Amino acid sequence: MFLKIHPSRETGDVVAVCDRELLNTTISHEKLTITVTDAFYGNTPATEAEVKAALKNAGNINLIGERSVNIAVEMGLVDKHCCMMIGKVPHAQIYQL
C-alpha cells in the first residue's frame, strides 16, 4: 500500500491510502472516473501497521483498493456495505464530524 498524510489544522490530518497496484491508474465505472495519483496517495510504501497508526489519528480518510479498505473495516472505521464500488475496486471516504 501507499500512504500519504496531508496535514490540516482545521479538520485534522487527511490520510490517503491506496493499494500498490492502483497507483497511477485510472478507474472508471459508468459516469465516475478516478485517477489514483501519487500526488494525493503518495509514493511511500507503508506496512499494515503504519496504515493503522495513521488511520487512528486521522480527521479525514480516503481509501481505495481491497487491502486499504479492509484495514478500515477491520478497525471498525467503516462498514464494508457503505463503501462505494468503482467497477470492482472498493473506495471509502471517512469524515470525522
Each language-model region and where it sits:
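Structural motif
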Residues: 13-16, 59-62, 92
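C-terminal structural segments of small proteins and small subunits
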Residues: 71-97
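Mid-chain, well-packed structural core segment of small domains
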Residues: 49-75
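Solvent-exposed alpha-helices and their adjacent loops that cap or buttress functional pockets
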Residues: 6-10, 53-56, 84-85
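Conserved mixed alpha/beta catalytic, RNA-binding, or beta-rich assembly cores of soluble enzyme
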Residues: 1-49
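Fold-independent oxyanion-binding glycine-rich loops
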Residues: 18-20, 64-67, 97
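Low-complexity, flexible helical/coil segments
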Residues: 41-43, 50-56, 96-97
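Short, surface-exposed, polar/charged, turn-prone segments marking secondary-structure boundaries
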Residues: 43-46, 63, 89-92
